[in-house]
Amino acid sequence: MKFVLLLSLIGFCWAQYDPHTSDGRTAIVHLFEWRWVDIAKECERYLAPKGFGGVQVSPPNENVVVHNPSRPWWERYQPISYKICTRSGNEDEFRDMVTRCNNVGVRIYVDAVINHMCGAGNPAGTSSTCGSYLNPNNREFPAVPYSAWDFNDNKCNGEIDNYNDAYQVRNCRLTGLLDLALEKDYVRTKVADYMNHLIDIGVAGFRLDAAKHMWPGDIKAVLDKLHNLNTKWFSQGSRPFIFQEVIDLGGEAIKGSEYFGNGRVTEFKYGAKLGTVIRKWNGEKMSYLKNWGEGWGLVPSDRALVFVDNHDNQRGHGAGGSSILTFWDARMYKMAVGFMLAHPYGFTRVMSSYRWNRNFQNGKDQNDWIGPPNNNGVTKEVTINADTTCGNDWVCEHRWRQIRNMVAFRNVVNGQPFSNWWDNNSNQVAFSRGNRGFIVFNNDDWALSATLQTGLPAGTYCDVISGDKVDGNCTGLRVNVGSDGKAHFSISNSAEDPFIAIHADSKL
């Protein structure tokens, strides 16, 4: 009995680090600003059959409607109530999405904005996505309800201007946003009620927006109030998966490690450093990636949520600066995402974006605020073209063959060791995942031609970067692995995608 009790305690302690994906699925995708009706369809027609584990959705709760500039993406990070009612859809549509995605084994993770309400400067009235009244100047949010008692004005009513002062970072206003007093049980209860409503609907977990701006103990107090996941889709006693947005590039008062007790943290150093390597800036080269992960100063793998770019830093917000790779840098981006999905470190998130007209002046995009593709503020449908790409300015990186097939690669090699590393002391590298998968990159300015140990059983394999295995045939390159596990690889430095990946399920 003692043994059983101990196991159940361990299970409880570890639950918030477990994404609760089904069938050994290992990656999630952020369908940034997508409507719930489009996500429900995408779960059924694409994400489930292609092996995606889940979707991070944009904040589902009512936000302020901003008209200057016109309907920016960041208005969704200015809540005014916890009603499920945004330009992505209403509560019925949200419930339908969660049910349909769960029914095909794809989980939903909610971007929870619980550090603050909207900016103090928003006018009083009903300029909100569901018509609820707000009076930020008087701290009135009657749809919750919150009043002046529920904010941190008595501790700090100014902006954060010193990130070396943890008190300021957590009690003052992030870019003018009214900071909630999360040490008050009333506020904790209101936040937990909102999150529990979503858990009961069937979500699997949460991204905690602006976690760095909340005290770890306050977050824990909220998490302690949360229900177990819905047993219709999750095993009894399952706790919500938690990943906290903590931007810690080093050199500030607050460290990501302070939040490990609550769940995983977003490892922003990952994309910033990998981008620098793939761009070959500062003398970095891919051969240095041999000890990628903790060896590069990243948080422990089982505490990391990793990504090449996110909705903030792909437009110069958040963290990472100019080294961040995005869909605008497609060739390098596919290499970076390929490396991420092949490497065992961290739990991976793929980005799915929309296009906007960039306008750089003095190195800054003046249009970094632009919201999703829309007609007069109504978000456009995600249409699917004949070639399986998306229309209406939705980028759908998760549908790019090279990325989609690497999501499948990660599923196939899950749990296998990082082995058979090879490099040329420059930017040609290769490694296997045990005997289940092998990947080789050429990021040099000259051709790669090498016979490498793949670790794979003998046979002919289909390269899943240049093509697909279809009905036992290969639409891309074929790789012949000998009885000694070796194969010859040739990759031109001018190839559209200068990398090759093969795995157990791509064997012909």
Curated annotation (Swiss-Prot):
Q: Per the annotation, how and in what number is the cofactor bound? A: Binds 1 Ca(2+) ion per subunit. Binds 1 Cl(-) ion per subunit.
Keyword Signal in record: yes
Broad enzyme group: hydrolase
Upon changing residue 161 to S, the result is: In A1, B(A) and B(C); requires 2 nucleotide substitutions
The secretion signal range is 1-15
Q: Where in or outside the cell?
A: Secreted, Extracellular space
Q: Catalytic residues per the record?
A: 209, 245
Q: Which Pfam families match?
A: Alpha-amylase, Alpha-amylase_C
The feature of type site (Transition state stabilizer) is located at 312
* GO CC field: extracellular space
- Residues the record lists as binding chloride: 207, 310, 349
UniProt keyword terms in alphabetical order: Calcium, Carbohydrate metabolism, Chloride, Disulfide bond, Glycosidase, Hydrolase, Metal-binding, Pyrrolidone carboxylic acid, Secreted, Signal
> Which GO MF terms are attached to this record?
alpha-amylase activity; amylase activity; calcium ion binding; chloride ion binding
SMART domains, sorted: Aamy, Aamy_C
Hey, which family's this protein in? Belongs to the glycosyl hydrolase 13 family.
Please name the PANTHER family in this protein's record.
ALPHA-AMYLASE (PTHR43447)
Q: What is this protein called?
A: Pancreatic alpha-amylase 2a5
Q: What organism does the UniProt record list as the source?
A: Mus musculus
